Curated annotation (Swiss-Prot):
Its EC number is 3.2.1.35. The active site is at residue 131. It catalyses: Random hydrolysis of (1->4)-linkages between N-acetyl-beta-D-glucosamine and D-glucuronate residues in hyaluronate. GO terms for molecular function: chondroitin hydrolase activity; hyalurononglucosaminidase activity. Keywords: Disease variant, Disulfide bond, EGF-like domain, Glycoprotein, Glycosidase, Hydrolase, Lysosome, Mucopolysaccharidosis, Secreted, Signal. It is an enzyme of class 3 (hydrolase). The lineage of its organism: Eukaryota, Metazoa, Chordata, Craniata, Vertebrata. This is Hyaluronidase-1. Residues 1-21 form the signal peptide. Highly expressed in the liver, kidney and heart. Weakly expressed in lung, placenta and skeletal muscle. No expression detected in adult brain. Isoform 1 is expressed only in bladder and prostate cancer cells, G2/G3 bladder tumor tissues and lymph node specimens showing tumor invasive tumors cells. Isoform 3, isoform 4, isoform 5 and isoform 6 are expressed in normal bladder and bladder tumor tissues. It is linked to Mucopolysaccharidosis 9: A form of mucopolysaccharidosis, a group of lysosomal storage diseases characterized by defective degradation of glycosaminoglycans, resulting in their excessive accumulation and secretion. The diseases are progressive and often display a wide spectrum of clinical severity. MPS9 is an autosomal recessive form characterized by high hyaluronan concentration in the serum. Clinical features include periarticular soft tissue masses, mild short stature and acetabular erosions, and absence of neurological or visceral involvement.
Amino acid sequence: MAAHLLPICALFLTLLDMAQGFRGPLLPNRPFTTVWNANTQWCLERHGVDVDVSVFDVVANPGQTFRGPDMTIFYSSQLGTYPYYTPTGEPVFGGLPQNASLIAHLARTFQDILAAIPAPDFSGLAVIDWEAWRPRWAFNWDTKDIYRQRSRALVQAQHPDWPAPQVEAVAQDQFQGAARAWMAGTLQLGRALRPRGLWGFYGFPDCYNYDFLSPNYTGQCPSGIRAQNDQLGWLWGQSRALYPSIYMPAVLEGTGKSQMYVQHRVAEAFRVAVAAGDPNLPVLPYVQIFYDTTNHFLPLDELEHSLGESAAQGAAGVVLWVSWENTRTKESCQAIKEYMDTTLGPFILNVTSGALLCSQALCSGHGRCVRRTSHPKALLLLNPASFSIQLTPGGGPLSLRGALSLEDQAQMAVEFKCRCYPGWQAPWCERKSMW
């Protein structure tokens, strides 16, 4: 093993050099990428506050917009004629997927995609954010139960003499069949129009591991969730990336349960990818810089539990999302800038560089380092005794300077193994595949 480890005795990295490798496809052969999905250009345009993420090796659209060449997100009102119910129970575009026109939806979606992504060779992230209903009947609880109620009512109106169990079974089949047609059809159209885009739905898969108050909380997906997710194989098969949410609920603050929560949510994404027959399907969890629905920034240990945990499991990257509400005032923009400059940015540089160095040292530069199950707490963070972050004279990207010691490399080999990129194989990804 020691013979394989690369003798990186004087490896110097600068973010400028790393960023130059981005042109072309966004993710291939890139161990870990942080994508900025925030409208922070408002901070500059409206408040004169420049939240500069480029110096920390973060990928952002020109002008830091929600939609651009590197990252485009479609909310429900921006793609086709998504059917849903308002909070007052009023149907929009038919309310139910089985009560709406898929043909009309795809026709409008065709135009919406061409307008939002004009470049035919678009190779960025293409995320669809539909949250009103879920494609599995069993997952539509609480406020989403209206979709089950209205589905039953639709069948009952057509067959008033049917018994309740028959109505339930047919309503479930109709809803799930229509939900599949809508979601799969939308992905298929996106892939046909922009075939290099990383198409996928935000929030899928979900682990539903929200039982934080349990005294024996482990973070594992509750019983039955994996079986339900396995029924969504058609969704994983049509997706070109998976975008699970690892937003930190506010109730987790100070509990010490965050790492378990994130660990199993990210692991479920990798599990469904393998189950769907595509172990190389990119996983890019969505992360907020705040605890969800608060203005409390994630402290450093929670960044380790979210970004760091994702990188350690071999995620292709993360998507950092910031609500427009967090950029409404000059004070909030200044707070984001300070957090980026002092806490978030240096951490991103640390974990991104750690993933790259591990890939080079352990995986011949042809794969990602993935944490071994025997070391569930290991992270791809640089040894502060070996590396330092330095300002570039006159501004510009920060420089990460240092060298991997033999001890650093040996520890990586103990704690991590390789997941090879497509086209490479062997324990250290040193051989090209024959297929």
